[in-house]
């Protein structure tokens, strides 16, 4: 099986978000779609591989976040024989993306949403298949296996392709921007809202290592071969994020004070990692700004969820 990495040019930036084209014999599958604006790039990669949209058997989304699944409906519309494969909690949102669109539009504003994501097209329910943990589907000379991986999102799975010695990890095995690898491996977790769970995120990293695959393909970004090194860096920074959450809880922080604390502490954790890697003056360091902000939001949201559950338990 051959794996082709497609740079989706997300946010008009190279090396930020990828989709993957899997080719085995006369069958093709896409893992991730990025946004509807990325679909021409995916189809161009398919043509370059000597295949047609009619030969696409599967379109796979690791989770429903729009930089991963926003183009699923548009891609399915031009791949007439494809089945969309999704986590059971993600599949309903592919069929009816109303809530996802409303939430993202509220965050970004209508104009910015349109600029980033274009039109989100529903996928007919009859063409969507939900995969349970451990499920397999036939593909080419082998199978694709699905492993549920909470921590980043409750509707997340990773895709194991043993015939390619590969696991496609979405956001469950961190972010590795190619532009920041000059001084060696620089990987970090995504703890964005609304499902960040430190313990589950640690477990997801371990589950990915346990697949035994020699190559990981995170959506952000590209083929990685040092899975053990990635896991070490991810566990370290997950511990740092968990410590921020615990300190904020112990200090009773809430509202703007909680948000400011999380932003400052997450920024400090990233700054320490940047300094240790010798990247303080790297021209592409601004790539991290959005991730720092989202990670801090995720920590604050996780604490709010914890407190809500506590209050419910007390009655």
Predicted regions and their residues:
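C-terminal regulatory/interaction regions
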Residues: 243, 247-315
């Amino acid at each position: 099986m051959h794996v082709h990495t497609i740079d989706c040019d997300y946010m008009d930036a190279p090396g930020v978000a990828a989709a993957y084209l899997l080719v085995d014999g006369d069958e093709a599958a896409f893992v991730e779609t990025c946004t509807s604006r990325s679909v021409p790039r995916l189809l161009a990669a398919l043509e370059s591989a000597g295949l047609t949209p009619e030969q696409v058997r599967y379109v796979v989304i690791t989770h429903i976040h729009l930089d991963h699944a926003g183009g699923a409906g548009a891609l399915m519309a031009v791949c007439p024989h494809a089945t969309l494969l999704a986590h059971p909690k993600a599949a309903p949102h592919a069929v009816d993306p109303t809530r996802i669109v409303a939430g993202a539009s509220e965050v970004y504003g209508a104009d910015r949403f349109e600029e980033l994501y274009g039109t989100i097209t529903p996928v007919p329910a009859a063409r969507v298949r939900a995969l349970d943990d451990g499920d397999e589907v036939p593909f080419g000379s082998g199978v694709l296996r699905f492993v549920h991986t909470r921590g980043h999102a409750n509707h997340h799975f990773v895709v194991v392709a043993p015939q390619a010695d590969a696991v496609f990890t979405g956001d469950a095995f961190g972010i590795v921007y190619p532009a920041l690898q000059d001084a060696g491996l620089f990987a970090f977790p995504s703890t964005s809202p609304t499902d960040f769970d430190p313990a589950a995120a640690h477990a997801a990293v371990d589950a990915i290592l346990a697949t035994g695959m020699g190559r990981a393909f995170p959506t952000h970004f590209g083929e990685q071969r040092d899975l053990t090194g990635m896991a070490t860096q991810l566990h370290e920074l997950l511990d740092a994020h968990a410590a921020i959450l615990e300190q904020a809880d112990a200090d009773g922080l809430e509202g703007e004070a909680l948000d400011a604390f999380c932003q400052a502490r997450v920024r400090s954790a990233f700054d320490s990692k940047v300094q240790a890697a010798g990247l303080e003056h790297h021209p592409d360091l601004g790539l991290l700004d959005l991730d720092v902000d989202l990670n801090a939001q995720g920590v604050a949201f996780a604490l709010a969820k914890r407190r809500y559950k506590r209050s419910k338990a007390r009655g």
